[in-house]
């Protein structure tokens, strides 16, 4: 993993761009971390990654975290670990930096929604938009599981917007 930058408007911030693990249960032909690829594998524990992020943040090496992961055990197990990293950073360490989480295709709506409570940004990789191509290159994945997290994120954004509208007109 190496640091990177993200720029919004005229401001760029340095990010720790890291994967929780490069192990993966899937064997997607397009992915370097596919199960059949013979490469060194590594996994952070939740606490290791939280401590590493905080150490870099305290030393002003980074201003935020960009976190992704290979899929270990199943999508919910992996997503739950990503959420725990963000939650621990926010609630235990009072981390005020930027957090961008990659949502795991196939993860439950509840976990994607919980991720949205702690992350500044959620995104989903959609490598293959057509179902027939997905079956060719990633036969263990299905189209619905790839697109579901985007739907969950969109619904969460709309619900949040509705809540803000309600409170904007509340009596003071």
Model-derived segments and spans:
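Short Fe-S-cluster ligation motifs
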Residues: 52-68
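Ferredoxin-type iron-sulfur electron-transfer modules and their immediate structural context
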Residues: 1-2, 13
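Conserved, mostly hydrophobic/aromatic
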Residues: 15, 28, 67, 124
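Canonical Radical SAM [4Fe-4S] cluster-binding loop centered on the CxxxCxxC motif
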Residues: 18-47
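Conserved AdoMet/S-adenosylmethionine-binding subsite of the radical SAM
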Residues: 50, 73-172
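Short acidic, glycine/Ser/Thr-rich loop/turn "cap" segments at secondary-structure junctions
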Residues: 33-39, 65-75, 99
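Short, small-residue-biased leader/transition segments that mark boundaries at the very start
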Residues: 3-8
């Amino acid at each position: 993993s190496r640091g990177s930058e993200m720029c919004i408007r005229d401001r760029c911030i340095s990010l720790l761009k890291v994967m929780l693990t490069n192990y993966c249960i899937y064997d997607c032909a397009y992915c370097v971390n596919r199960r059949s690829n013979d490469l060194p594998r590594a996994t952070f524990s939740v606490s290791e990654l939280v401590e590493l992020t905080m150490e870099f943040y305290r030393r002003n090496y980074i201003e935020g975290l960009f976190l992704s992961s290979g899929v270990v055990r199943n999508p919910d197990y992996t997503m739950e670990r990503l959420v725990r990293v963000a939650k621990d950073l926010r609630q235990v360490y009072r981390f005020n930096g930027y957090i961008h989480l990659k949502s795991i295709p196939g993860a439950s709506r509840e976990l994607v929604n919980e991720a949205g409570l702690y992350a500044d940004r959620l995104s989903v990789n959609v490598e293959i938009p057509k179902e027939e191509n997905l079956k060719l290159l990633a036969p263990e994945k299905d189209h619905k599981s790839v697109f579901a997290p985007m739907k969950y994120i969109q619904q969460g954004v709309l619900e949040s917007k509705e809540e803000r509208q309600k409170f904007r007109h509340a009596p003071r």
